């Protein structure tokens, strides 16, 4: 089997393999040529052996390459009260960072 890891970033968990392209919540400012390193590795399977952290695995990291900034789908929140002429519409688009997973280090 192909090695994979479970990482945590932005209070979400992602199962990643080398070569995967994922969108994670914006991590602040990242230069266009920068490498992104995820330190919170919860689980690693290297093809033969599984390693489980409690809560994270010490010295394990996942290296990724920055690709671009993207925006998610628009989410619309609408409040309405009948017969009172009260309605509020609010929209939101979450900003994401698109990264390509390069390698998983244990």
From Swiss-Prot:
Which Pfam families does the UniProt entry name for this protein?
Answer: Ribosomal_L21p
User: Key word rRNA-binding present in the record?
Assistant: yes
Mention any one GO cellular component term assigned to this protein in its UniProt record: cytoplasm
Task: Give the molecular function GO annotations.
Answer: rRNA binding; structural constituent of ribosome
- SUPFAM superfamilies reported in the protein's UniProt record: L21p-like
Q: How does it assemble?
A: Part of the 50S ribosomal subunit. Contacts protein L20.
Keywords noted in UniProt: Ribonucleoprotein, Ribosomal protein, RNA-binding, rRNA-binding
Question: Does Cytoplasm show up as a keyword for this record?
Answer: no
Give the family this protein belongs to, as stated in its UniProt record. Answer: Belongs to the bacterial ribosomal protein bL21 family.
Q: What does this protein do?
A: This protein binds to 23S rRNA in the presence of protein L20.
What processes does the entry annotate via GO biological process terms? translation
Q: What is this protein called?
A: Large ribosomal subunit protein bL21
